[in-house]
Every structure is written in C-alpha cells, then in structure tokens.
Amino acid sequence: VTSVLTIIWTFGMLGWVGVPLNILSAMIPSLIIVIGSTEDTHMMAAFLRGLAEGPKENSRREAIKYMAKHIGLPMLLTVLTTTLGFASNLLSNIGLIQHFSFAATFAMLANGFITILVMPLMLSMFGKHEIPSPSGKETKHLPDRIMSVFRYSQERFPISILVVTAVLCAFFIFQASKLYVTNDPMSYFPRDRLLIQDAKRIHEDLAGIKIFFISLKSKQSKAFQEPKNIQKLMNIQQFLDNQRVYDRSISLADHLKFINQEFRGDSVRGSLPGTRELVAQYLMFLHRGDLDSYVSHDYRRANIVVRHNISDSHTLNQYIEELQEVIDQIVGPDMESFIVGENLMVNNVAESLMVAQVKALALLMILIFLIMSIMFTSFKGGIIALVPAIIPIALMFGIMSYLDIPLNPGTAMVAVIAIGIAIDGTIHLLARYNELCRRTSDYVEAVNSAVNDEAPPLIVSSIALAFGFGVLIFSNFTIVAQFGALAAATMLFSIFANLLITPIIMTRIRLIGLYQILSMSIDLEVLNNSPLLQNMSNYQRRKAILISELHE
C-alpha cells in the first residue's frame, strides 16, 4: 500500500514539474517497492517485539506505542540517509543522472512520510493482538542459521576477522584504482541487438559518422599558403593513419595534392606543390565554398576533418591524448593547435562523472558521519556507522575493476545509493544496542541481544533489496542491468558488514544517544547537592549518569 501510494505521488510530481522519464527513471517503481519495504520490515519487527514485551490488554495499541518510541528516531534517520544517498547524485553534470536523482529523492521522502503515517494506522486495524505461543519444537529460519555462523566466528576469531576484512578491503581498493569512465551509447544495448548489428553494417560501408576537427592557428597572415605549413597538415594526417583507428581524414593538403597530381601526372602522386606561388595558383581552381571547412579566408587557420566510429569515450580519449602530444611536436611553438568536436565535448563531460561521484560519495559520508556523531554524542558513533558502509563499497568497486565494468551513468550511482541504503541497518542496530546498554552493564550481552532483535529484519530486508535490484539484471539496457547486479551484490555485502564486523566493534565501545540525554528525567536538587557532579553542566551530568555502570 505504501509503495503504491509513493509511486502515484512520485510520477504525479514528475508530470507536474515537467521532469522527463529516461532509462534510469524507469527503475524508480522497483526501487520504491524494495527500498520502501525495508522500513516496513523494521517497523513490523518492532511491533511484534512490543507485543511480546507489552501487557496483554490493549496489546495492539501498546505495541504501536512501543514501536513509535523505540523505532521512531532510527526510522527518521534512515529515511534521511537514504534520501541523501539519492540526492547526492544531483551534483552530477549529466542530465540523465540529475533527473533520476530528483525523482528518486522525492520518492524516498514521500515513501518515508507515507510509511510513518499509514503503517501505524494499518497495524492498529489489521495487526495481531498477540504473538502465538511457540511450539515445543524450535525451527531455525534462514536469519537464525546465518547468525549462528556469524556468532561462532565472532566469539572465536574476532581479531582475525577484522584483519582479514582490512586486507580484503585494501586489495579491492587497490583494484578500484584501475576503474575508468566511459560514455559509449552503443554499450547501453546487448551486442546481439539489431540496432548494434545495423550500426556495424553501416560502418563497414561508410566512413565513420562521428567527426572531430584538428584546428591549427598561426599568427602570420596567409600562413597556410606556405608549403611548409601545409606539410604540417600532411604530417599530422600521416600520424592519424598510423594510429589505425580513424576511418578518414581530409584537409587542405588533400585538395592541393589532388590538383598537383592532375597537372603534373602520376610522378608527383601524393606530393604537395613546392612553392607558395604554385599553391596560390592551385587555390584559384577551387571554389571558396569548397574550402570553408578546411581553411579560413585569411589562411591563418586550417582544419583537418577526422571521421571515425569510436563510440567508447575512454578509448577515444586515450588516442586523443596521444594525438595532441604529436601535434604539438609537429606544429612547433609558432602555431596553436586545438582538437575540438561535439563528441569530444560530451566525452569530457563523461570524464567529469568520476569527479562528480567522488564529490557525492565524500559529501554523503561526511553527512552520515556528522549525523551519527550527533546522534550518539561522540565521533566514535560516526566512525562505527561508516565502517559497515565503507566495506560494501570497497568490495563493489574492486569487483567492478576486476570484471572490467566501467563507470557509466548507471554504475556510477551505485556507491552513493548503496551507502544510503546499507546504513539503514546500521542505524537500527546501533539504536537497539544503545537502548539495551541502559538495562545491563554487560556490553557483550547487549550486543548479542541487539543483533538477535535486529538480525531478522535486517537480513530479510537486505535479501529483499538484493532480489529487488537483481530483477533489473533482466533489463534490455546494459547499464540498468549492471546497476541492478552491483546494487544487489552490495546489499548482500552489507549483511556481512552489519552483522559480522559491526558487532565485534560494538562490544568494545559504549555509545550514548542524544535522545536519551535530552529525554532523561532527573531531580535537579539531588544533582546540585552531589559532590561528584559539581561544576558540570546539565548536559554533562546527564551523559555521565547514562554512561555510568552500577556494580553491587
């Protein structure tokens, strides 16, 4: 119900503000369903926990109150972090990603708002009144089996697990350093598609449909009536031929070579006229309109038109860099050289994709660190929250590099979106642990209880997310399929990070929530008369009491 309402709101908003749909926006309904269901799962788990711990009378109402009290703040934070994960992609310079980011950001906010309003209402009307008594035979479900393996490893090899995880992350981060950006529209489709086959057939019969220009500019008037300068055009074209990646190049030199051959015979085939006067005479045989694409009216500028069929921006940019170095050597200091073209401008924007995603990732991690540090009144809380977020991302980028999957408009978004989603489980786990620490001084027992309470919804929601993203693998668009596969893998990695690594760290650190400090009820007269709490602010007194342990 919450997902259907969110989908209606989202597409209504897109139509109202005039944001167009694209191949990435088509994923939004699936994202709303799988991501929205995770909060429903955590709320249902808290509701059932409230039924188990609350009184029998008015059990449904008391369970809803319990749910609101214990999961309200964590849920607000998870909605915020998930929204930030999508919103950070607004920093991209690519309209395709910006439109998707806007739609997904609104969808996450709308889903959070609808879930907070609708879910308690539906539970009050259709929720259980009590939890059935357990049967004599206890059955282990999938979350229980996973946690039994994790708990065995945590109790016996905690240090080894941390060391192995650190080594794995270092290895995959090293692999991630080999990632590259590409903007290849043809790679958006499987190779067996008719469109790809037709494009290959056209390339076999015609020169490349893509064009860029090599422009040379001299300070001297009529510089490109000098044979030595025209020879520079010819030398550049010879290097283009040697690169063996372009279909054809045309310049003023080709026109002059053709006329020279027609006048002087095959003995001078491929040769330029030897004097400036001869060049001027040959130019008189050409209409001005025939030369507009190759030389300016004052002959200070000359162009080489290069036709090619390289659609992969990463490959083309490598050849362009090599070409620019050679051109600078050929033309010397007396001329300026430029390599320009519409597809090169698009490629430069694509290269900025890497920078934009690094900025978005850094911004999101800083925001999560600050939010969690404020929530737990300590930088340690922010650091702990980042650990299970960094591990899946490091593994994902490493796998991308190992499998030679480039950064493109689809895969570039996985990191920030996955962090925003994966951190949800961490927030619920830390919030539950923080609550249980008030009841016991045994941190290990508090961690185990928190994991037991939060593992089922966390595992179920992560697996549901993995399946939800995994459905996108069957998309006809390659970048959407890659996005789905990587996001699904990241969700599974987050189970490992949240339930194996985070509990090991939690047993060694005590956290106090800001909400607990602000909501704590204390007798000010008693505190003012306490020698131990003298010269402390009210905030410091509250935190000292909450972090203290009582031993008999």
Q: Predicted regions span which residues?
A:
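Membrane-embedded transmembrane helical bundles of large multi-pass transporters/channels
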Residues: 1-184, 311, 328-520, 524-525
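Solvent-exposed, non-transmembrane loop/terminal regulatory segments of multi-pass membrane proteins
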Residues: 150-152, 178-224, 239, 272-295, ...
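Envelope-exposed proteins and targeting segments
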Residues: 29, 210-212, 245, 300-302
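Generic non-transmembrane alpha-helical segments
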Residues: 205, 235-245, 322-334, 446, ...
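Extracytoplasmic
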Residues: 1, 231-234, 278-365
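Regulatory nucleotide-sensing modules
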Residues: 528-552
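Hydrophobic, well-ordered secondary-structure elements that form the walls
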Residues: 202, 214, 240, 249, ...
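Alpha-helical transmembrane helix bundles of large polytopic membrane transport and channel proteins
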Residues: 243-285
